[in-house]
Amino acid sequence: MGEPQQVSALPIPPMQYIKEYTDENIRKGLAPKPPLPIKDSYMMFGNQFQCDDLIIRPLETQGIERLHPMQFDHKKELRKLLMSILVNFLDMLDILIRSPGSIRREEKLEDLKLLFVHMHHLINEYRPHQARETLRVMMEVQKRQRLETAERFQKHLERVVEMIQNCLASLPNDLPLSDGAVSVKTEPMDVREPCTDHHAGPQEAAAASLKETTIDKDAAMCVIIDEMT
């Protein structure tokens, strides 16, 4: 039995479009430019909209009768609309039982439609508040994550500083050479007489002195590593 194929929740992007946005085309500046912003009007779901239209248009501009006053409490009006929808729905059921062909059936349908339009309109007026609240919560989550990351980093930093301080405190003032450390020759070196070679003598002496200093530093570092481990 083969492995189950993963199905994407979104449709596959059109290949004739995405193939133009390769890394090479983007690097060479050959990728298509984004479309220009719409300035006048646009079509959406078969309706024409103006760019300067309000996000939530008043009911009067849509030719819909307003059932609630201009100044109102959204919570109270939503509850009133919910109760009105319930009462009209029960009336609709009673009409369908007693006289299905009555003209009152169409009237109740229009009443229910108007009530639902008002309820959706009042809910949509909460969308800007919902967007601001969602953004606020998202920023609070990001802030909390960054503070937690900074706190963990500070703890690791303090731990590293403490380890370094403990290592420095454990080091003696006079570092002795361990048994496995590199031994340094203490015998005097044979230095040629200046009369035999005027140029090689000082250079060889300087090189030997530098080598001896390097060996001392290497030996001290070996001692430090041995004590840490």
Curated annotation (Swiss-Prot):
Pfam families named in the record: Med7 (PF05983)
A GO cellular component annotation in the UniProt record: mediator complex
Domain of life: Eukaryota
Disulfide bonds: none
InterPro entries recorded: Immune_Mod/Transcr_Coactivator, Med7/Med21-like, Mediatior_Med7, Mediatior_Med7_sf
Coiled coil ranges: none
Keywords from the UniProt entry: Activator, Nucleus, Transcription, Transcription regulation
MF (Gene Ontology): transcription coregulator activity
Subcellular location, record wording: Nucleus
GO biological process, one term: regulation of transcription by RNA polymerase II
Major localisation: nucleus
Similarity annotation: Belongs to the Mediator complex subunit 7 family.
Function of the protein: Component of the Mediator complex, a coactivator involved in the regulated transcription of nearly all RNA polymerase II-dependent genes. Mediator functions as a bridge to convey information from gene-specific regulatory proteins to the basal RNA polymerase II transcription machinery. Mediator is recruited to promoters by direct interactions with regulatory proteins and serves as a scaffold for the assembly of a functional preinitiation complex with RNA polymerase II and the general transcription factors.
Assembly, per entry: Component of the Mediator complex.
Name used for this protein in its record: Mediator of RNA polymerase II transcription subunit 7
Organism: Xenopus tropicalis
